[in-house]
Design a protein with these regions (language model features):
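Bacterial N-terminal signal peptides that target proteins for export
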Residues: 1-8
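Mature extracytoplasmic or otherwise solvent-exposed domains
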Residues: 24-169
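C-terminal segment of classical bacterial N-terminal signal peptides
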Residues: 14-23
Length: 169
């Protein structure tokens, strides 16, 4: 029962982090010459709601026949302790799990890259506890903190660095 209360509080804390703005950088030096956001389009905006990160779509013009790869990685980091049967804390832990979605976007006939909305969901406390094992099977794991972070990148074929990078929170 205590574990469920802690999980509920941690879920609220994760939601509170959603108000933190993401850091976005567009560098069209890492794109085909002439690449630009099409009129009416802008840099994608990523938002965190609960465990899910959603990044808006965009359209990039002037890319010729160059395709791009979009990655969205959501990392859930859990801190906590393992407790023995006597109630003593015996082993602290910090573990991270990353969920990644990858899409290859093909340029259109007129040299535009239409990037759809991207979404990925991090690992919940319940999912983490279902698979995490303390070093001793007789110990019980308790989560005391959770954080969510994400990294969105759009990298053009033939380039080693992303043209768009968004990280948060």
């Amino acid at each position: 029962m205590r574990k469920l209360g802690i999980i509920a509080v941690l879920s609220l804390l994760v939601t509170a982090f959603a108000a933190v703005p993401a850091l976005a950088v567009t560098n069209f030096d890492n794109a085909p010459s002439g690449a630009h956001y099409r009129t009416g389009s802008a840099e994608p905006v990523c938002t965190l709601s609960g465990l899910t990160v959603t990044c808006t779509g965009t359209t990039i013009g002037g890319v010729g026949n160059t395709n791009a790869t979009v990655n969205l990685a959501v990392t859930s980091t859990f801190t906590g302790t393992c407790t023995n049967r006597g109630g003593h804390l015996v082993e602290p832990f910090t573990e991270s799990e990353t969920t990644t979605t990858t899409s290859v976007i093909t340029s259109t006939r007129n040299g535009q890259l239409i990037v759809p909305e991207q979404s990925a969901t991090g690992t919940s406390s319940e999912e983490f506890l279902a698979t995490f094992e303390c070093p001793n099977p007789n110990w019980t794991a308790t989560i005391s903190g959770t954080s969510i972070s994400f990294l969105y990148t759009l990298t053009f074929a033939g380039f080693t660095e992303p043209a768009i990078t968004i990280s948060g929170p």
